[in-house]
A protein has these predicted regions:
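Conserved active-site tyrosine of GNAT-family acetyltransferases
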Residues: 2, 102, 107, 129
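Acetyl-CoA-dependent GNAT
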Residues: 3-61, 72, 132-134
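Short hydrophobic/aromatic beta-strand or adjacent loop that forms the aromatic wall/cage
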Residues: 22, 124-128
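Conserved catalytic-core motifs of GNAT/GCN5-like acyltransferases
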Residues: 41, 88-91, 108-125, 134-135
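Conserved acetyl-CoA-binding loop-helix of GNAT-fold acetyltransferases
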Residues: 58, 64-81, 96-104
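A beta-strand edge to alpha-helix "cap/lid" segment located at domain peripheries
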Residues: 72, 82-90, 94, 113
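Acidic/histidine-enriched, glycine/proline-rich intrinsically disordered or flexible terminal extensions
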Residues: 135-142
Length: 142
């Protein structure tokens, strides 16, 4: 059964992001968190050091206000500034709004994992979208 995180759990997660140096952008409307975006390591192996997996979340009360796009633009600029080569988005196949935003921002479809997750009493397919950048001028060998 899917369990929502408590405020304390989410705050600890935010703190861990800060401690690890991973970017975390929060969209605030009148003191209320309307959304956030972050990225972290795609895989915990040196060969993948230039690839990140991102997350973007917008509260349902703030859908269709352009918040996800604004947050994603911030993440993309941060990734470029940090020599990221590839940014990966892993999206529930049924989340067409997120897929459309990613496509609008230049992400391209790169694959599907069927039945990758189980949530809300059903199996979910996961689609991968990626955006490639120049990356580092002199990448380090793993």
């Amino acid at each position: 059964m899917y369990k929502e995180q408590t405020l304390e759990e989410r705050l600890r997660w935010f703190e861990q992001k800060q401690i690890s140096g991973e970017p975390l952008f929060v969209f605030d409307i009148n003191g209320e968190v309307a959304g956030y975006a972050t990225y972290g390591s795609f895989r915990a192996y040196p060969a993948y050091q230039y690839t990140v997996e991102h997350s973007v979340y917008v509260h349902k009360n703030h859908y269709k206000k352009g918040i996800a796009s604004k947050l994603m633009h911030s993440l993309i600029e941060e990734a470029k500034a940090n020599d990221v080569k590839t940014m990966i988005g892993c999206i529930d196949k049924e989340n067409t709004a997120s897929i459309k935003i990613h496509e609008k921002l230049g992400f391209t479809y790169s694959g599907t994992i069927r039945n990758a997750g189980y949530k809300f009493g059903r199996w979910l397919d996961l689609v991968f979208y990626q955006l490639d950048f120049e990356g580092p001028e002199n990448p380090l060998e793993s």
